[in-house]
UniProtKB/Swiss-Prot annotation:
It is a single-pass membrane protein. It comes from the Eukaryota. It comes from Chlorokybus atmophyticus. Its main location: plastid. This is ATP synthase subunit b, chloroplastic.
Length: 187
């Protein structure tokens, strides 16, 4: 600041003196209103100091309030960020627990389904075996019936050819005697 004032006074001192036309330095204090200017500047300085002081104080208060508000917002944002980080970590832990539980549940379901499939397979095999056995027995019984029927037909044909009247009476008596013995035994 002092350099600026020194430069200004140097420029003013080098200006030509006198009453020439144009711009020149007038050394007469009364003509230049230097006293009036000094009084106005002094009055401005005296009355403007309180105004400037109040203005600067208000500005300082506003700046300090803005800084405090910014600090409070920073603290709130930091707290919210920390809370969000904590919630995120908690969510990650819960997600990991859910994943682990779902893996366990999937394994349990897999084992259960494998057991059910095994049981169903065993039951189907047993049913197949029972069906095969039933069909085999049915086929065997059918074959037996056919064999017996054919044997009886052949026996009847042979007996018709071989039996005469006398032989038939003898067989009939023998059968009646056997039946009589059976009836006597059962009594």
């Amino acid at each position: 600041m002092t350099d600026i004032l020194t430069n200004m006074f140097t420029i003013v001192a080098e200006l030509p003196l006198g009453e020439e036309e144009g711009f020149a330095f007038n050394g007469n204090i009364l003509e230049t209103n230097l006293i009036n200017l000094a009084a106005v500047i002094g009055l401005l300085f005296y009355s403007g100091r309180s105004f400037l002081t109040n203005l600067l104080r208000n500005r300082e208060d506003n700046i300090l309030k803005s800084i405090r508000d910014a600090d409070e917002r920073y603290k709130e944002a930091t707290e919210k960020l920390q809370q969000a980080k904590n919630e995120f970590e908690q969510a990650k832990i819960e997600a990991d627990e859910i994943r682990a539980q779902s893996r366990i549940t999937a394994k349990e379901i897999e084992v259960s389904l494998m057991g059910l499939v095994s049981e169903d397979t065993k039951r189907l095999i047993d049913m197949k075996q029972a069906t095969i056995s039933f069909e085999e027995e049915k086929a065997i019984n059918e074959v037996r019936r056919q064999v017996i029927r054919l044997a009886l037909q052949r026996a009847l044909e042979q007996s018709k050819n071989r039996l005469n009247h006398r032989l038939q009476k003898r067989v009939t008596r023998l059968n009646i005697g056997l039946l009589g013995q059976l009836v006597g035994v059962n009594d």
